[in-house]
Amino acid sequence: MSEKLYPVLPEAKKNTLIDNETYLEWYEESVSDPDGFWAKHGRRIDWFKPFTKVKNTDFNGDVTIKWYEDGVTNVSYNCIDRHLKSRGDKVAIIWEGDNPYIDKKITYRELYENVCRMANVLKKHGVKKGDRVTIYLPMIPEAAYAMLACARIGAVHSVVFAGFSPEALAGRIVDCESTFVITADEGVRGGKPVALKENTDTAIDIAAKQYVMVNKVLVVRRTGGKVSWGRGRDLWYHQEVASVEPHCEPEPMNAEDPLFILYTSGSTGKPKGVLHTTGGYLVYASMTHQYVFDYHDGEIYWCTADVGWVTGHSYIVYGPLANGATTLMFEGVPNFPDQGRFWEVVDKHHVNIFYTAPTALRALMGAGDEFVTRSSRSTLRLLGSVGEPINPEAWEWYYNVVGDQKCPIVDTWWQTENGGILITPLPGATDLKPGSATRPFFGVKPVLVDNEGNVQEGVADGNLCISDSWPGQMRTVYGDHKRFIETYFSTYKGMYFSGDGCRRDEDGYYWITGRVDDVLNISGHRLGTAEIESALVSHHSVSEAAVVGYPHPIKGQGIYCYVTLMTGADAQDPDELRKELVQHVRKEIGPIATPDKIQFAPGLPKTRSGKIMRRILRKIAEDESGALGDTSTLADPGVVDDLIENRQNKK
């Protein structure tokens, strides 16, 4: 843990929206009078019918979470229409293509027309309020248009990251019974095409076998690559939008009407459809965007995430646009054409606020400072980090080399389930400690509990829970409220359990220590070990598999797989079989789930009741076999010796 303290920079303090005094005052009000506080801040968005009820939440029993429940509004209206009068000609989205010579600026007025046209196309093909629309698009402006068009007509979008495989896409189509898909002919990433339409066709075939029929596929022409065509089903986006009006009335939505479903990995099998609703989500996303990034009108803001992840939803699209900001969307990758790309984009578009993930920073740090220092970065004012805890070395590099010691770093902790940032510094209010997410945002009440559920006071380590609701919180797991309660509210009664471990220091600062359940954090993206295990076991040579994380210098965590083979399968060349299994997992889930290490084992360490002792597997994967603890409960302690002997990452 870093003991270094970086006081608030004078420059950051000078123009800040929130200084320390204001933070302490607002925070106190937000936790002592949540109704009064959130009533006031709920008015930051426009309501067609104002709310009279603010907070109606209960973390016990059947768990109900409702905010502003009698208010009526529309997210698309708040992100576009209400800005037209005062800033219609202001740039809403700067799009930077994969190719550094291609970019596009879209004003709020152009955004309005594009979104209205797409909304009218959806309506023309029978999409109604409450219908689920699957969006499987690269980082192109049409991805934002599609999300906002769904919000405009009251359809519920489910964005699937364009790096996911056809199998993963199919699972998400089936779970929410989506009959309309929006995709592109191909994506472009690092100069290479990504076969999105082909993947979509495969996914639709898989979904059909599970009796979910996709009726229409709207295809954006991105590359002009050759694609197969389903007559009567497939529609070209450019042809469809040309035939409809550029105006579409926003559907009046109740604050608790669903806005989107976003699938996230859990510690058990299939991904969970996290459901966010309309009013509270937008209040929270826009408020955190404004105050965490200390956003001032006219600034250029860039979050490098993909819209396939929650960070892209809240901090590329909804938060910034609700605030009338200029938000940058980047199609490419940090190392194409070379490792200086991020900083060239910063210079090219005069970026003031930059928000990225530690995994990208670690990779760029390894490439050397000259890729950074050849750019000026003189417009940068604030840096942010998201996705996983940032190690102090990467933090220092980010602060000293990228930010030239003049940009505060907001190290933000939050999750898909949270809708927006929960623990974070505020640039004009919070002294910084490298590696610490520091203090809770307004209305957020973090609690550390031990494994028995006892609340820990003062300096402590524990499981991170939140003891009361905030407006951006997810409402349920789509179609499975029981799973929602079991996952988040059954471990510690009356509290939301994050699944993360955490330490609180003597200044009341929070330090996230990583997952405490069977979920991996790979490059800032969550993957369930059960998901990867079931992909491995679906291969004909594999009898059993156990997956754990281990420290990885770039990705934060790497994927370590222990595999027991079917009888006879061990006759295969182990290196060939490893390659085959890696490809198999990539096909089942996507490149994000590529195993880093595969260890073949005659057996796995199990208790007499048949439970795999993951703690032991984790220690071996971390090359800490001296710290295995008690192995006396194992059915066959001899298995452990073989695992240690053949471990894949001996130091």
Swiss-Prot record:
Classification via HAMAP family: Ac_CoA_synth
Primary role: Catalyzes the conversion of acetate into acetyl-CoA (AcCoA), an essential intermediate at the junction of anabolic and catabolic pathways. AcsA undergoes a two-step reaction. In the first half reaction, AcsA combines acetate with ATP to form acetyl-adenylate (AcAMP) intermediate. In the second half reaction, it can then transfer the acetyl group from AcAMP to the sulfhydryl group of CoA, forming the product AcCoA.
Posttranslational modification: Acetylated. Deacetylation by the SIR2-homolog deacetylase activates the enzyme.
Stored InterPro entries: Ac_CoA_lig, ACAS_N, AMP-bd_C, AMP-bd_C_sf, AMP-binding_CS, AMP-dep_synth/lig_dom, ANL_N_sf
Binding locations of ATP: 387-389, 411-416, 500, 515, 526
GO terms under biological process: acetyl-CoA biosynthetic process from acetate
Family: Belongs to the ATP-dependent AMP-binding enzyme family.
Residues recorded with modification N6-acetyllysine: 611
Enzyme class: ligase
Keywords of this entry: Acetylation, ATP-binding, Ligase, Magnesium, Metal-binding, Nucleotide-binding
One GO cellular component, as annotated: cytosol
Naturally occurring in which organism (per UniProt): Brucella ovis (strain ATCC 25840 / 63/290 / NCTC 10512)
Annotated CoA binding sites: 189-192, 311, 335, 523, 586
EC number of this enzyme: 6.2.1.1
Cofactors (names): Mg(2+)
Residues that, per the record, bind Mg(2+): 537, 539, 542
A GO molecular-function annotation: ATP binding
Protein name: Acetyl-coenzyme A synthetase
Catalytic activity line of the entry: acetate + ATP + CoA = acetyl-CoA + AMP + diphosphate
PROSITE patterns named in the record: AMP_BINDING (PS00455)
NCBIfam families registered for this protein in UniProt: Ac_CoA_lig_AcsA, PRK00174.1
UniProt key word Zinc: no
